[in-house]
Amino acid sequence: MAISCIPAQPRGYAGVPASHSKEISSPSRKQPARDTQNGQSKTSPNVSKSQKDLIRYEGYTVSFNEKYLIPNWVSYELTSTETNGPYSRKGLNFSQDPSAKVKQAEDDDYRNSGWSRGHMAPAGDFKWSSRAMVETFYFTNCCPQNQSLNAGQWNTLEQKVRDWARRYGSLTVYTGPIVLDNAYGTIGYNKVVVPDAFFKAILAGEQSIAFVMYNHNNNENMQKCAMSVDDLEALTGIDFFAEQVDDFENQVEATYNLRNWGL
């Protein structure tokens, strides 16, 4: 089946050669330590040396691309109870993470650029913790994103992820940018790379699904943006959910059923 939202094969995933990025291990959830040394997380000795920078926050983990100044991917678990909480994004603005020992974008890079500050780990998934909410507003979790996409189909997909967490009890979620031919160039003094597209990969028990959306005013039907995790892995060169047993991973990632996701 043709899927109109799938971009052409990228040169590499957010600038990381695909042959290397396949080695990345899936991070565990909610590790408070997030210091990095020599480009490798102190809390993740099993992370491949090909990994650029891994930063662990209270609610999510980010693989950060210091060359492009955007994430390679973010990953977290979302449970049904975490879809609601007392903490709001009100009054929060993006800023640099003072604890991250990596070069980061600045607010001036985005100002008057024509691109929105797009969360990869959405603030709405972290209402259960004040600290986790604040940490979603670091530039280590941000990409230049088309505002119509940010407030439209991408926002709809983020809301559906919360619906699926309530339905299935728990999800593992990966989100990130895809850099193709860098058609949109860079923004700001620091030359923050503008992605060509964005992806989500979602695992719920014994089923999975993935989505890709171009970084423009994307009005494509959600079903047309869906694909198997295997297809997304072929597109990005990333091995999602690598902590799963190979036979289980291969079976679950090979197919997807839109009806299981209410699509």
Where is each model-derived feature located?
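Short, His- and charge-rich active-site/binding loops that engage polyanionic ligands
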Residues: 55-117
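Short, charge-rich amphipathic segments
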Residues: 39, 74-88, 156-167
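Context-gated lysine
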Residues: 22, 30, 42, 49-52, ...
